[in-house]
């Protein structure tokens, strides 16, 4: 991991590669580098740290070569260092390669290569590819790449250049995303469309085992056997503005403020003649009615959206539902039948563990639905149907608008299953849909009105070393997301627990000034949450309560209150999540943290 770019064309590659790497910074990384064909040799420069450091170094060179590759690295094999940064080169320096993924048999390959006299200069698994290419190269870089990949076990997205083939980039992939596009001035390759967004909107999403030979004049696609194949072109409707902050101090705040639009866009066209319509799922009402078990599988923030979905699907459709972390689901033996529905939730659509879980579920006979933000992503392609969250590109590492889009999409799915099962009548569907649509306006109110109370609470908590998030029902599910957001971007340790579990352990943590953040909105379990607040307050906790507007009683039990509009309990996760996002961001800003690119994190986890 983490980001690949490449260009071959009419213009100097250096600036194009740096621009592409800058746009991939949001994915998280610890070092960066480029390789450019300069004259009859390769110029390779890499630096530990930010792309800006690499750009500063390159300002002293001003390479004019028009073909090159670049990479931002998030360490998997080998510590973050200049030596471990990509691109990696062959012994003679004639071939350079960049790689996303993990090569599982690299230790065995390295031992063999060293035994044949190859000298390694890094700790990475990627460097074995450069040496394999060197051994296999006989004048055709794509053929050498095909030979090298026949010996590799693992996941990879690879791009390579050779000084003996001017203007050529060889590309392939297996279980790691690669997109290729032809612009007016040349050919582009990247691990993420946003790196080439100003050059083309029509891209080819390379398939597993497919190869591309890129030149300034065109791109040739072949399969593992070397036979020509027709590319599948996907049009992506993203604006260049997505890669800009648009006047906000950071992408996270911008994306938080985009959430009302995400709700509206995700719901657009979903109610037809009073009934829910999600044609992309490609299952008839009769087939949906046969579903008797649901698994929601996801990782990180998406897992928390799945917890909310579990409550809604069981509550409305009365179908037994489990929400499981994808990396755990795939390594046990879940009960799956042809009437089992597996719902895979992934912002990027390329999360490695989620993809592996999908494949396992399909082998066992399950129907698979995907919920993702990326058109044409692996999750979308490998599912029987897909709901797109319509959040557009999310740049900040900590998910906000994509999370809300997932919650809205999963809410629609719960309503659709209940409709198919006959558990919700048409008039109930229409009422729920209208109230769900109204949450967009309620989120706008939160964004407009809650800033003072959120910032006051953040200042009170910024110097804490730990925090506890609690809630019941929907509040418990959203507490997990609040705690994750806080620790992701502020590095303040936070845990989340169902409030009813307080006396079973977590209450031992509480002493004078210990922050307890509670979801205390009006709900069937409101009185029990208040009881938990009283227990915490009696032990010296500093209480921050997210509460329903008009609830004056909560002030007796909380030091800080953040009021949000009253909504149906089923939709409370949508409105309650927004102040928790803003709260986490405010604390991170107070602590001087980089909210868009928190340390050690990657936006998209494409390795296991």
Language-model features: where?
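Glycine-rich oxoanion-binding loops at beta->alpha junctions
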Residues: 70-83, 272-286, 309-345, 351, ...
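Generic C-terminus detector
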Residues: 226, 542, 555-557, 567-608
């Amino acid at each position: 991991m983490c980001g690949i770019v490449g260009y071959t064309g009419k213009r100097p590659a250096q600036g194009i590669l740096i621009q592409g790497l800058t746009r991939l910074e949001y994915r998280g990384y610890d070092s960066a580098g480029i390789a450019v064909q300069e004259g009859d040799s390769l110029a390779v420069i890499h630096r530990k740290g930010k792309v800006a450091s690499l750009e500063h170094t390159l300002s002293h060179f001003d390479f004019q070569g028009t073909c090159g590759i670049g990479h931002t690295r998030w360490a998997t094999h080998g510590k973050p260092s200049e030596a471990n940064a990509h691109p990696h080169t062959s012994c003679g320096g004639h071939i350079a390669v960049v790689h996303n993924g993990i090569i599982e048999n690299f230790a065995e390959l390295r031992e063999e290569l060293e035994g044949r006299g190859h000298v390694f200069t890094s700790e990475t698994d990627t460097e074995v590819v450069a040496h394999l290419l060197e051994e296999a190269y006989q004048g055709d870089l794509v053929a050498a790449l095909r030979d090298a990949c026949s010996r590799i076990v693992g996941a990879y997205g690879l791009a390579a250049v050779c000084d003996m083939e001017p203007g050529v980039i060889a590309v392939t992939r297996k279980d790691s995303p690669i997109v290729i596009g032809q612009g007016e001035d040349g050919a582009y390759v990247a691990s993420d469309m946003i790196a080439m967004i100003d050059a083309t909107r029509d891209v080819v999403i390379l398939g597993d085992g497919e190869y591309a030979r890129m030149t300034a004049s065109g791109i040739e696609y072949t399969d593992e056997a070397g036979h020509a194949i027709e590319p599948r072109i996907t049009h992506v409707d993203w604006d260049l503005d997505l890669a800009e902050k648009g006047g906000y101090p950071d992408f996270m705040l911008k994306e938080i403020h985009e959430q009302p639009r995400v709700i509206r866009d995700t719901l657009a066209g979903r109610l037809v003649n009073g009934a829910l319509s999600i044609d992309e799922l490609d299952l008839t009402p009769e087939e949906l009615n046969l579903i008797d078990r649901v698994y929601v599988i996801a990782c990180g923030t998406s897992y928390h959206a799945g917890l909310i979905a579990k409550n809604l699907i069981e509550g409305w459709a009365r179908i037994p539902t489990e929400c499981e972390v994808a990396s755990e689901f795939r390594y046990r033996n879940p009960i799956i039948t042809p009437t089992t529905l597996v719902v895979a939730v992934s912002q990027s659509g390329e999360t490695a563990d989620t993809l592996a879980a999908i494949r396992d579920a399909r082998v066992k006979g399950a129907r698979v639905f995907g919920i993702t933000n990326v058109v044409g992503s692996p999750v979308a392609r490998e599912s029987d149907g897909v709901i797109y969250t319509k959040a557009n590109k999310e740049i900040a590492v900590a998910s906000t608008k994509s999370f809300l889009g997932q919650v809205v999409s999963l809410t629609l799915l719960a309503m659709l299953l209940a409709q198919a099962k006959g558990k919700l009548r048409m008039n109930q569907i229409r009422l729920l849909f209208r109230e769900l649509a109204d949450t967009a306006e309620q989120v706008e109110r939160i964004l407009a009105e809650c800033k003072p109370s959120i910032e006051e609470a953040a200042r009170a908590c910024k110097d804490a070393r730990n925090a506890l998030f609690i809630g019941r029902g929907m509040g418990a599910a959203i507490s997990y997301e609040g705690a994750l957001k806080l620790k992701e971007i502020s590095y303040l340790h936070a845990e989340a627990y169902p409030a009813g579990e307080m006396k079973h352990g977590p209450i031992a943590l509480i002493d004078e000034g210990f922050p307890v953040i509670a979801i205390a909105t009006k709900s069937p379990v409101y009185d029990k949450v208040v009881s938990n607040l009283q227990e915490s307050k009696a032990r010296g906790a500093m209480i921050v309560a997210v509460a329903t507007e008009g609830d004056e009683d909560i002030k007796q039990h909380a030091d800080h209150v953040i009021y949000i509009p009253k909504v149906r309990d089923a939709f409370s996760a949508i409105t309650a999540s927004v102040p928790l996002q803003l709260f986490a961001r405010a604390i991170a800003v107070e602590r001087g943290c980089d909210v868009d690119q928190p340390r050690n994190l990657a936006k998209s986890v494409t390795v296991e």
